[in-house]
From Swiss-Prot:
It catalyses: 4-hydroxy-2-oxoheptanedioate = succinate semialdehyde + pyruvate. The active site is at residue 45. This is 4-hydroxy-2-oxo-heptane-1,7-dioate aldolase. Homohexamer; trimer of dimers.
Length: 263
């Protein structure tokens, strides 16, 4: 067993990604052929569940793009279900401290290293027990990315980085800017300073920094600073703005809804 996304992060190769919120295996497969290194299937803010995640994993599987899945919460039961349908890389939201980071790691490991329930005879991940010695190989193939999105998490970042099994730390600029009192403005100098400092801390600890930023200039800036997994757009935004722009070119009134630049 291997995890190409985890291997790329370990090798220090920057990975460029796209956020998936349409909950569609059809659009997921379309985007899997677009050339992104990874695709984030969002279960926190998009209406995904285990069956819709599964169909998107199946759609992406023939392509080089690697799937990353964000559950709605740091919940071992939900994580267990996602791992059983074949998720290897998780982005766990709203991790505030080392204890919560350890819980996320333990949820992805079989005992005695963790608390993942054993049900490989029912699991796509083990090819229904057709993968030899799956239970003893699975732990090493897991990639755990934890998401820091508050001032509290930033304060606890050194301890989070000390947690064995955390492969990367993802900075959530939308929630972080809101928590810092600059909601809707992740480009505020105070927020940017916090993000840049966090990227440096994560790199110095030997972990992979990640972020979502649809602002191309800022996304490239984060890559220059050492971010290793950067999502540079969102499928819903690409579809909505592209459709609006096309309609506007043929006379439709264009409404400026504004954007934080994150999504």
């Amino acid at each position: 067993m291997n995890n190409a996304f985890k291997d790329a992060l370990k090798a220090g190769r920057p990975q460029i990604g796209l956020w998936l919120g349409l909950c569609s295996s059809y659009s997921a497969e379309l985007l899997a052929g677009a050339g992104f290194d990874w695709l984030l299937i969002d279960g926190e803010h998009a209406p995904n569940n285990v069956p819709t995640v599964l169909t998107q994993l199946q759609a992406i599987a023939p392509y080089p793009s690697q799937p990353v899945v964000r559950p709605s919460w740091n919940d071992p039961v939900q994580i267990k279900q996602l791992l059983d349908v074949g998720v290897q890389t998780l982005l766990v939201p709203m991790v505030q401290n080392a204890e919560e980071a350890r819980l996320a790691v333990r949820a992805t490991r079989y005992p005695p290293a963790g608390i993942r329930g054993v049900g490989s005879a029912l699991a796509r991940a083990s090819r229904w027990n057709r993968v030899p010695d799956y239970i003893h190989q699975a732990n090493d193939a897991m990639c755990v990315l934890v998401q820091i999105e508050t001032r509290e998490a930033l304060k606890n970042l050194p301890q989070i980085l000390d947690v064995d099994g955390v492969d990367g730390v993802f900075i959530g600029p939308a929630d972080l800017s809101a928590d810092m009192g600059h909601g809707g403005n992740p480009q505020h100098p105070e927020v940017q300073a916090a993000i840049e400092d966090a990227i440096q801390q994560i790199r110095q600890a030997g972990k992979a920094p990640g972020i979502l930023m649809a602002n191309e200039q800022l996304a490239k800036r984060y890559l220059e600073l050492g971010a290793l997994f950067v999502a540079v757009g969102v499928d819903t935004t690409l579809l909505a703005r592209g459709a609006e722009a096309l309609a506007a070119r043929f006379g439709a009134e264009k409404t400026d809804l504004g954007s934080s630049g994150v999504y």
